[in-house]
Amino acid sequence: MVQLTIDNARGVTLCRVSLPANATVQQLLLQLTVAKPELRQAQAIRNDVRHVTHRLTPASTTTTTTTSVVSSNAQTLLQAGLVGQGATAETLVVLMAADAPAAASSAAAAAPSPTKAVAAQILDLFGCASASPSAGVRSQASVVPSTMDERQLELQRRIYAQIQQQQIDENLANALEYTPEAFAKVTMLYVPCTINQVLVKAFVDSGAQNSIMNKRTAERCGLMRLVDVRMRDVAVGVGRQEICGRIHMTPVNLAGMYIPFAFYVIEDQAMDLIIGLDQLKRHQMMIDLKHNCLTIDNINVPFLPENDLPALAALGDDENAMHAPRHQDPATTATTASNPAAPVLSEGERQARIEGFMTVSGITDPTQAAELLEAADWNPNVAAALLFDT
């Protein structure tokens, strides 16, 4: 199947259709008239990339065919030269009565500039990616046409990056509009408990394989005498921490219930106590997020509100907020990342950058190239982004 993008003489996309390469021109016209009835008056179909203009007979402009009509419209798209052998995507221009004479006299002059041609191919690439699955999988040859030289390929990469950033920005805007709750701060799950009459705020973490207690809390609760040093080891997760040993059993008071817990004692652990998956499964505890509590049998232990969380949890939220990524304009990001301050360039260096930027971008006016580079603090990547934005 070939994905055909149908444009008018002004470059406006009218529709997209999918046909096999051996389909006839008449079959193409039938599909076009279904999508756009006004296209039944088409006079010619042109492929600017292949420099082919296929004239249509009057009989082909109707939506019915007869066996007595034998015209050029009976040719296949391949025979007419409108599509290439093995091509998966083509752009065709439909010429109406007012467009055909002018197009015939100035076909070469109407050829798009290299920059606009590459931009159109990239936009077509993204449009085909969001089309129906019947459009087929684009081959590598259609993504990087053999007609492109190195300068066009560099332009293609920059346009691709610009369009990708625009789609990321649109995705962020949609998320902010439709799912703003995804950006809200999540309150950590802590429950109050008592060990040897010492109040401890325990962090409930179903992602922790074992329940752990830091050495400072074990000393505060008078449990160091129960630490089995034969269980010394090294905990490997986010970093490495030394395990002092294991407390095989100690009663923990949760909402008036004395439950035997086992803990590994960590030398340097930020959280006082973590109830891990081992004890959650052992005592069949259920994390009930709907009612915001830890359920043990028929008893609910409410999670601590945000204002009662340990100072460490609040500090961690603040640090996460400080280091959270913020949205920035792609041009601004590139400027601040690559050039914190405008570089001081000599006249020769500026002239060299202007010539290099003109070579890559296809700009023929040195004044325009210099203005774009000055606006981008002489960063060619940012200047290219500004060029494509305009």
From Swiss-Prot:
Its EC number is 3.4.23.-. GO terms for cellular component: cytoplasm. One of its GO terms (molecular function) is aspartic-type endopeptidase activity. The keyword Ribonucleoprotein does not apply. Pfam families: Asp_protease (PF09668), UBA_4 (PF14555). It is an enzyme of class 3 (hydrolase). PANTHER family: ASPARTYL PROTEASE DDI-RELATED, AT13091P. This is Protein DDI1 homolog.
